[in-house]
Amino acid sequence: MFKTFDDLADSVLAGTPADREAALAVLASEDDVLLDLVAAASRVRRRYFGNSVKVNYLVNLKSGLCPEDCGYCSQRLGSDAEILKYSWLPTDEAKRQAEFGLAGGASRVCLVASGRGPSNRDVGRVAEMTEAIKDANPETEVCACLGILKEGQAERLRQAGVDAYNHNLNTAPSHYEEICSSHTFQDRVDTVDSARSAGLSPCSGLIVGMGETDEQLVEAVEALRQIDSDSIPVNFLIPFDGTPLEGTWELTPQKCLRILCMVRLMCPDRELRIAGGRELHLRSLQPLSLNVANSLFLGDYLTSEGQAAEDDLDMIVDGGFQIVGQEDAKALRDRLRAHRAAHREAMGGAGAETGAGLPPCAGGGCGSHAAPEEQQVPVEQPVPAGVGAAQPAEAGVGTVRHGLRDDAGRPLVPTIRRRGAGTDALPNS
């Protein structure tokens, strides 16, 4: 067993990633040595990734009405969460949404659709979207996240230019039945294996804060090492009202940092991404987390709002980090403002800043098939009381707005996404 965290970092840098005993010791460490732990994990992060931060951008191609019963998910079967629900975005709208993220500094676009898994027709849609995005932006990486894949589908995506496939293991094998019964842990492993065999970079991570033990956290990361995930997103549970995990708040900012350090020390050379829920749980310690993680999602998530995209960029630059693919932060911000202004003007000026006139998103069944094209109709989404509507001005200027707060002022309800894909409002990018 190591004596200090620096000793542990020395061992990792010498070629021996943290084992189960060391990982559990990291998770059990006290708050008063947290900065020592972060400093040790930062040494490992900088050995493999220098001071770079990779920016990723999510485009929710199809939202809600999923037939699976994952207990953490606002899009699950039986969810009462008042999220946006719509069927497939048209290709040109998917490309447009992706380009907002690229203008905001992203080098990877993540194309995501709800459902158990795609039909061959759905794979064709995503292939077409990928080709459209890459024709206009050839240096862009595209990651697809469509659920459980059938035979030949990973190969079709790779042929279209998709670079990576995301399918999170989410939790430990021993905990999986506690959060989902409509598919198995092995189903997820098989899809990651299929993606890798087709030449796609495997992206797979976890969700923390779902009632798992420290032992199960380590077990989950051991499983990620076994499937050889290139990129590991760490999501922090967003406990949506209307889901089985509603009201579950188990994490502290310090615990979140310890989890990130544990993952970095167990998987030293893998992209480690702070993902959904980071604003809710890391809170004011978000900037510190970039000394451990080397990747994040820009702006909003699939069904909830993130912090303002410009705040994301400021957090990266103010921490002394370099955005992958971007040489100058000021030039990036200037391009971002020009990009937004051009889109507002194209939509009719100030009166159209919410995006009026964009193709409506269609309603229909989710799962392995979308609704037939001739049956697709716009779905109106009422904004429930207490939930802020998307801002008509520039997206990304405000802050995360949450309704309920505890005595310390911490948000207790995530803000539902009402801008970007599936809406007439400019995205947070």
Named regions from a protein language model:
Residues 77-205, 209-210, 214-227:
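Conserved Radical SAM active-site core
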Residues 15, 41, 70, 111, ...:
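Conserved, mostly hydrophobic/aromatic
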Residues 42-43, 131, 261, 287:
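Active-site phosphate/pyrophosphate- and oxyanion-stabilizing loops and adjacent acidic/basic residues
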Residues 53-57, 109, 142-144, 165-167, ...:
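Hydrophobic faces of well-ordered beta-strands that scaffold small-molecule active sites
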Residues 36-79, 86-110:
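N-terminal pre-triad scaffold of radical SAM enzymes
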Residues 1-32, 225-429:
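Auxiliary Fe-S-binding modules of radical SAM enzymes
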Residues 4, 31-37, 42, 212, ...:
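Zinc-dependent deaminase catalytic domain
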